[in-house]
Amino acid sequence: GAHLGFARGWPESPVRQGADLVIQSLHKTLPALTQTALLHANGDRIDRERIRRFEEIYQTSSPSYLLMGSIDACVRLMEAKGRQTMEAFSLLLDEFHAGLAGLDQIVLSGREIMRQGRMKDYDEGKLLIAAQGTGLWGGFLYKEMLARYHLQMEMAGDSYVTAILTPWDKEEGLMRLS
């Protein structure tokens, strides 16, 4: 996620972890327009000249200045306020998870899996809402979340939906989700 690595308590960004090539979709978790992303070449194992050749093949001769401006504004914002924004988001997520402690039927994966030692790290902004054994299926949950609660889920599986929570989600939306 493009939002990772800005504050303690969150996983490090793949760039800082040493990934050779990273594509960060800004529009998923940061305040940037849809279709915006950054490509990072990291270290000396990447042939940058080869990347430039492919860019020449696939890039447009008429770039969207609106999208490029959105990328620039997003990067500037995160440079100036990224840590502060992510720390405030962490506090909001703590409140959100505390409000979900008494759920009987629906399982929220993530923190519990971490406590069991089955995962090294995870992004608390990704929420897997699993409904195994409830008689509900993911497609139904997906549609209900939108129709009844005005919440757009990222995707649906057989027995779950995935939500992506961001620092720019309103507390009101998180309360509807809880």
Give the ranges of each region predicted by the language model.
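Conserved PLP-enzyme active-site core in the AAT-like
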Residues: 1-109
